[in-house]
């Protein structure tokens, strides 16, 4: 089922945010926002993302971190994590709430100190980290077409739906995250092998620092206790099979589907 968007009236930020949340709740699809909003840019997309977060907070959710989608040589994209998205190792993924899910291995940084840009370096970012975990993130786009732009993804909170971190955290000292790899395995076999340096500008801490500087331009900081996910790229999630990501240094994490 698709949600039809008006092409004659410029939607307001709050109404677009409400439609995205409604589509998620009802498992409905909608055209990419850039189809109806020709002027959709990153500034407007982040306003929509923040308004959607405000509406989620009003219904009782709490911010617990951010997702970082790093892009080579350009400013990373960020999305919000709330407590409603966090899964425990004993939880089953609520696949009945998803339309076309994907899954990706992520490095999860748990912050020990507040990180506020501008001017944050990778070294400063890593020094602010308390523990590092293996993780999995589940994505699920609201869009019915494949023509979505980067601002479309931002408005939809980077398609982030759920995340899970492994049972064991590691102090960042002594870890060489620039060489970290992870493979995702499902019942049908291994899907992919991912190098985090391929998408995180040679070290995931570079993405963490860039995210802090990006958030500062919008008046935000990365707070103590937050989880920051730095990922690779999602692969299709075969519903009904457990998914395990095995990391080279951070051990493994399994998501029950």
Kindly label every feature range from the protein language model:
Residues 222-235:
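Conserved metal-binding segment of the jelly-roll/cupin
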Residues 8-203, 209, 217, 236-238, ...:
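Catalytic-core "active-site belt" of small-molecule-metabolizing enzymes
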Residues 212-219, 232:
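Short leucine-rich amphipathic alpha-helical surface patches
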Residues 206-213, 224-227:
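Short, structured beta-strand/loop micro-motifs enriched in basic residues and often containing a Trp
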Residues 1-7:
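Actinobacteria-biased recognition of intrinsically disordered, low-complexity terminal regions
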């Amino acid at each position: 089922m698709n949600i039809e968007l008006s092409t004659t009236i410029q939607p307001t930020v709050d109404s677009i945010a409400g439609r995205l949340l409604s589509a998620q709740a009802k498992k409905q699809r909608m055209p990419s926002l850039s189809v109806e909003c020709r002027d959709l840019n990153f500034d407007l997309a982040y306003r929509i993302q923040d308004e959607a977060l405000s509406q989620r907070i009003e219904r009782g959710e709490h911010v617990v971190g951010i997702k970082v989608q790093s892009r080579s040589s350009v400013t990373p994209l960020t999305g919000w994590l709330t407590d409603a998205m966090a899964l425990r190792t004993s939880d089953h993924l609520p696949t009945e709430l998803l339309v076309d899910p994907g899954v990706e291995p992520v490095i999860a940084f748990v912050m020990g100190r507040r990180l506020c840009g501008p001017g944050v370096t990778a070294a400063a970012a890593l020094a602010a980290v308390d523990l590092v975990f293996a993780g999995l993130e589940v994505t699920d786009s609201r869009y019915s077409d494949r023509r979505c732009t980067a601002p479309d993804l931002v408005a939809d909170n980077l398609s982030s739906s759920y995340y899970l971190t492994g049972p064991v955290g590691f102090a960042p000292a002594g870890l060489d995250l620039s060489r970290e790899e992870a493979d995702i395995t499902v019942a049908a076999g291994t899907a992919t092998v991912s190098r985090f340096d391929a998408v995180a500008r040679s070290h995931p801490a570079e993405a963490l620092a860039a995210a802090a500087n990006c958030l500062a331009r919008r008046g935000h900081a990365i707070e103590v206790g937050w989880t920051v996910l730095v990922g690779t790229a999602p692969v299709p999630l075969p519903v009904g099979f457990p998914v395990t990501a095995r990391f080279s240094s951070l051990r493994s994490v399994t998501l029950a589907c």
